[in-house]
C-alpha cells in the first residue's frame, strides 16, 4: 500500500487538555489550509487520567486522498524531553531555625533531629527520599543545636555501616561567621542560608549540578524527586514548586498559589489572612480532584519543596534579590512575575511537623490500620542509624494499635494507641494510652537499676503502676512508680521545667533526662 509522509512542524508548549489538566502539548501543521493537532494519549493512574508529554501522534484529515487516509507514515516520537539525570541535580536540606513551635523537643536538638516513629529522626525523611530517588549529592545546612543532628548524619549516611553514597556525598554546613559586614550575621532565613553557602557549588564535586532541589527537614512524606524534577524539565521551568490541595482549616499556615491552565503559577501569597486568604481560593479540579474533593480543598498550598535551575537560583539570590532572606515570603512571590514558575501536584500523604500538636498527631497516626503513612516500603525504604539492638522482650502485655521499637523490655503492661521507642523499659502495671515514648540512648543493667532503687532514686524508664495518657516522653526520662500523667484538669499551656514537664496544646511533654518522682500526679 502506498503511504504518504507529511512534514510536521512541531512547536512544543503547554495547553489545556480537558477540564482537569494543566499539562499538555500541542502539535500543529498546515496542510491544504488545515490545522493538524494531536492530543496526548492518556493512561490511568490512581483512577485519574495522566498526560504523557514528549510524544507526537499523527491525525488524519478529510482532505487527504484515500491512500493517505488508510495509512499515514509518521515517527511516533518526533521530540522527547530530556530525561532527569540524578548526576545533574543536588539537594539542599534546610536544618530549620530555632524550632520555637516544637519547643521543648527542640531545647537541646535541631528540628530535623527530633525522633519520630519509634526509631527514626525527621532528617531521615528527606535523606531517604533523596537516596530512593537516586540523588547522591546532598548538602545539609544547620544552625541551632546541631550536635545530635551531625552525629546522626555521620553515623547513618557517611561512615562505617551507614549508607554508601558511591561517588556522591553528604556535606553538612553549620552556620558560621566570616570577615566582612555580611559575614557577621547568622542565617536570616531559608534563602539566606542557601546564599551564604552558594560557593560550595563552585567545588569540583558540584560542577555538573544543573538543578537544585530545596527540601525542609521537618516534613513527613514519601516522594520520588525524579518525577518532580522531570516535570520541571518537561515544562522548561526556571522554578517548580511542589504543591498539595489544602482545606480551609489549615490554609492560612501555608504559602498559597493560583495557577493558569498550563500549571504556571500566576500569583503566590505566603500565609495570607482574612480577605487575602479568601481571595486565594481556586477551583482545584484543575489538579485532577473530583468536584467533591475540590469543595473540601479549595486552596493550592506550597509544600516548601522547590526545584531551581542552578543559574536562576544564583541570579535570584545574589543579584536580583540580595536582601531577600526567605523563599516562601520573598523569593518565590518575586520570581512569579518574571520567571517560569510551575506547580507540581503531590497528591499523597504529606504533613508539616512544625508544631507539638502536628508532631503528636502524626506520630500516633502511624499506629492506625491501615496507616495513612508508614515507614516500611520494600521499594522505597526509610533509612536510619543502625543500632544493632536485640528484639523487644514482652512479658504478659496487652498491646493494641501500637508500635514498639527494638531493644525494649515490657513487663505486664497495657499499651494502647501509643508508640514505644528504642531501649524503653516499662515495669509491671504500666498503662499507656495515646502516648509517644521516644526511648533511651543507653541501657542500665539490672544491678544498676537495683542500686538506684535501693537509694530511692528513679532509673531510666517507667516504674510500676504508672498511668500515662496524652503525653510525649522525651529520651532518657526517668518516671517513678505510681505516677499519673493525664492532665485531668484540661490545662492547655503550662511551663514547669523545674518539675520536668511542659504542657502544649493540652499535651504533656516530659523533658529529656527529666526525673518524675514516685507518686506524682500531673
Swiss-Prot record:
PROSITE patterns: ADP_GLC_PYROPHOSPH_1 (PS00808), ADP_GLC_PYROPHOSPH_2 (PS00809), ADP_GLC_PYROPHOSPH_3 (PS00810). Keywords: Allosteric enzyme, Amyloplast, ATP-binding, Chloroplast, Nucleotide-binding, Nucleotidyltransferase, Plastid, Starch biosynthesis, Transferase, Transit peptide. It comes from the Eukaryota. Its EC number is 2.7.7.27. InterPro entries: ADP-Glc_PPase, ADP_Glu_pyroP_CS, NTP_transferase_dom, Nucleotide-diphossugar_trans, Trimer_LpxA-like_sf. One of its GO terms (cellular component) is amyloplast. One of its GO terms (molecular function) is ATP binding. Pfam families: LbH_GLGC, NTP_transferase. One of its GO terms (biological process) is starch biosynthetic process. It catalyses: alpha-D-glucose 1-phosphate + ATP + H(+) = ADP-alpha-D-glucose + diphosphate. Pathway: Glycan biosynthesis; starch biosynthesis. Heterotetramer. Belongs to the bacterial/plant glucose-1-phosphate adenylyltransferase family. NCBIfam families: glgC, PRK02862.1. This protein plays a role in synthesis of starch. It catalyzes the synthesis of the activated glycosyl donor, ADP-glucose from Glc-1-P and ATP. This is Glucose-1-phosphate adenylyltransferase large subunit, chloroplastic/amyloplastic. It comes from Beta vulgaris. The lineage of its organism: Eukaryota, Viridiplantae, Streptophyta, Embryophyta, Tracheophyta. The gene is AGPS1.
